[in-house]
Amino acid sequence: MGNPKAFLEIHRQEAGYRPIHDRIHDFGEVEQTLSTRERKLQASRCMDCGVPFCHWACPLGNKAPEWNHALYKGDFELAYQLLTSTNPFPEFTGRICPALCEKACVLNRFNHEPTTNREDECAIIEMAFQEGFIQPRTDIQRNGKKVAVIGAGPAGLATANDLNHMGFSVTVFEKNEAAGGLLRYGIPNFKLNKAIIDRRLRLMEAEGITFCYGKAINLENLDDLDNLEKDFDAVVISTGTPTARDLKAPGRELKGVHFALDLLSQQNRVLAGMEFSKEERVTAKGKDVLVIGGGDTGSDCIGTAHRQGCKSVTQIEIMPKPVEGPEDPQNPWPEWPRTLKTTSSHEEGCTRRWNINTLEFLGENGKLTGVKVQEIDWMPNPDGGRPIMVEKGKPEIIKAELVLLAMGFLKPEHPEYPKNVFVCGDAANGASLVVRAMASGRQTAQKVSSFLLG
């Protein structure tokens, strides 16, 4: 630890976002960057704690104290080596991870000014690319074993990357026209520029990984799986959670009611150069938009709606409003705090409401015009089970020409596969964070290696 008093003398400084009046007119990344000097000062605040709770909280087990120290000292190559010893794709997590490590940081308990780990790791990996530290590996020794990875989201990419470095010949099958999964087709460009994904894919291809696009493997068709097993020694299923949670309220069939990914994935494809007919296009332009669901996907819909030129945005959530402030007494540090989160998209403008139940979608001539909702309360269950929903007041109507359902995804069910077939990421565990999917992918790569090589 180079400066043991830095956390006392230097306050947390975030890079912040581009001005709202600028960023809502384009899909460029909203987050700014600090200067190298400022970034090194932020890294110096890391105390190299005796018990590094940041390491405990990170699903990847990132060595934040070690690479923060190297960053502070200006040894960017060492910082890069330490960072990538646990994290295969810091350029992804450095942009979109909620930074579980920061909430568990000892400084967060001390003064609610944790180290800026997420921004630090993004700075390290971008410096590594800029300085040429990252080059395709040419020392990989092949072991003669072949592995198929089905699905090129963060879990599949992490699995493929690790297996390839272990010497396996890896082929990735992806149903879409490009790799990335929700990194590419769910997360907006204003949070993650897709050129960042393409840069990593070029590196993986140069190191020997084969990608087959537009190739959907029907996991319910045993012939598809049998054919893969004939050609590969092991198969990894990393297909994510493709089924969004629906809302079966009356009027669901009206034109204008869509899943969140209908908007998000199409917008990302439009930015990539794909064209859609007027009938196919899902757009918020000139419309009153209602987002149902209070999570990150709903937030992404808000930011996208603003950039498309919506008239207004309202976000409703059936659960109570989270605690405001740095921590919730019900789940104390170092746990992840269940507190109110305000994103860059929320800052761009929206009405947020909690304890709102959706009753009915309303329309005229087959087109959505509004949504009937009901304010509710959650009361304790005398039997100790799930809280009881109690209606308050009278139903009301929220005007809307576009509704976006952002209520999460259903965990897929899988049959019992042969021993050489592995499942990882969201496909195995249900919808979660990109960092958890990557960690699952890395763990699965180790399981495959142990199975095939002993």
Where are these predicted regions, by residue range?
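A ubiquitous short alpha-helical element
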Residues: 9-12, 48-53, 87, 194-195
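Residues forming the flavin
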Residues: 1-37, 42, 121-454
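Ferredoxin-type iron-sulfur electron-transfer modules in oxidoreductases and energy-metabolism complexes
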Residues: 24-41, 63-95, 111-139
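Short amphipathic alpha-helical segments with coiled-coil-like heptad repeat character
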Residues: 46-50, 113-114, 199, 365-367
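Glycine-rich phosphate/pyrophosphate-binding beta-alpha loops
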Residues: 45-51, 88-90, 429-434
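Iron-sulfur cluster-binding cysteine motifs and their immediate structural context
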Residues: 48-73, 93-124, 171, 178, ...
